[in-house]
Amino acid sequence: IKCHNTPLPFIYKTCPEGNNLCFKGTLKFPKKITYKRGCADACPKTSALVKYVCCNTDKCN
């Protein structure tokens, strides 16, 4: 799977074996700014400050 790995949506990398999810972390405050993107084996947990969304197709984050 290929995932974006910077806050900018046009830079991506091929994920290592076992990392079959892409994630996007968005700051909840002040304005839903994209904070972090990358590969994961499990979806990171949403916290008080960051909302994570995961998906499993190329460049879906």
Curated annotation (Swiss-Prot):
GO terms for molecular function: toxin activity. Pfam families: Toxin_cobra-type. Keywords: Disulfide bond, Membrane, Secreted, Target cell membrane, Target membrane, Toxin. Its main location: secreted. Expressed by the venom gland. The keyword Thylakoid does not apply. One of its GO terms (cellular component) is other organism cell membrane. Disulfide bonds join 3-22, 15-39, 43-54, 55-60. It is found in: Secreted; Target cell membrane. Has low cytotoxic activity. Belongs to the three-finger toxin family. Short-chain subfamily. Orphan group XV sub-subfamily. This is Cytotoxin homolog 3. It comes from Naja melanoleuca (Forest cobra). The lineage of its organism: Eukaryota, Metazoa, Chordata, Craniata, Vertebrata.
